[in-house]
Amino acid sequence: MDFLTDGIMALTWQQLVMYAVGITLIWLAIKKGFEPALLLPMGFGAILVNLPFSGVVNQTLTGGIQANGVIEWMFHVGIEASEVMPILLFIGIGAMIDFGPLLSGPSLFLFGAGAQFGIFAAILVAALLGFRLTDAASIGIIGAADGPTSILVSQVLGSRYIGAIAVAAYSYMALVPIVQPFAIRLVTTKKERCIHMDYNPKSVSKIIRIAFPIAVTMIVGLVAPQSVALVGFLMFGNLIRECGVLGTMSDTAQNILANLITLLLGITISFSMRADQFVTKDTLLILVIGLFAFVMDTIGGVLLAKFMNLFLKKKINPMIGGAGISAFPMSSRVIQKMAMEEDPTNVILMQAAGANVSGQIASVIAGGMVINLAASCDQANTVMAALTIMGKGMAGIFAAILIILLLVWILRKVSR
């Protein structure tokens, strides 16, 4: 009867820690409502993959028999071999996004670029702390505030920390209502937070709405080829939404596809949360660097808005810059809530929403930039390479966004 106790005897303290991590993620999903569609399956999966001799991961049984585990198979097929799961999720995300507020106020595009600063600041910090370049780049992409992008970039770059990166990315996305107000108050005054902004939306024609995702895909594909999979599927989802002839498919992409892929992605990514890989001091460092990235994203966007105000007669509420992260629509709602806390009559939701969807585009451009630059830089001199990625990455994002701005201006002129 010893076989009945084999599993118990094989338990390690690291596996017990992972059970606690899994239960905590499940608790955060159910009790606090933090990204439940992903944290709940991720938490349950963390328990599954850390059970001794678990049948969900590949095992060699007595007699040399190989037993294939379903979660390990899903990880190899859906993430490692093709990154198909995070990429397919972008179809659903694109179908959810309304670019109308952004297209009616194209200057909001700039805040999406400014709010990617945390990515590159975090890459530099990770490099200074001794992470190899590809791992530092993967950790930095947590600052994209975009879970699928974080997973895809870390997988393409072959990071050893994909599980910790995924947990950090989605956990901090859920904590946007806590992290962003703290960061914004660090660099703004009450007077700045009370600035009112006029909202005079210009109608956006159907032609522009259809042409925009096609043109953005082509431009970004030429400027940052490594972003094509990310931005292409995002814009394909948006084209399904805007074309007007695929209403049922648009609803399916927004609801059934997005929910199903998110569920599968959560439980699949848990394969990389095995105790021997996850319970390390590096995981704690990644969580700290990820938080730093989120804070610096917000600060970068806010400081860009404050810089622009030096040259504008009609001032921008600097909090709008903080909405330029990819956490949509959470960030725009947080900004509106903060504005009304300072002044109950201050409504800046639509401007914040425009900056927020700009962040969705900028984050996938940043993901492609990071992949390309990290692969081409000198892997030996990590800190210098991180500085190079920082300079070229931010310049590349702003260049791509400015080209898209020019495109929108041309489309609006032509459609009149």
Label the predicted regions.
Residues 1-11, 16, 62-67, 182-211, ...:
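Intrinsically disordered, low-complexity non-transmembrane regions of multi-pass membrane transporters
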Residues 1-66, 71, 409, 415:
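N-terminal alpha-helical transmembrane segments of multi-pass membrane transport
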Residues 25, 48, 79-103, 237-240, ...:
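Hydrophobic transmembrane alpha-helices of secondary-active transporters
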Residues 31-39, 58, 74-76, 96-111, ...:
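Interfacial helix-loop-helix linkers and transmembrane-helix boundary segments
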Residues 77, 81-82, 91-96, 110-121, ...:
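Alpha-helical membrane segments and immediately flanking helix-loop junctions
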Residues 160-178, 289-297, 320-323:
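Alpha-helical transmembrane segments
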Residues 168-245:
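Membrane-embedded hairpin module used as a gating/binding unit in multi-pass transport
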Residues 216-301:
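Transmembrane helical segments that form the transport core of multi-pass membrane transport proteins
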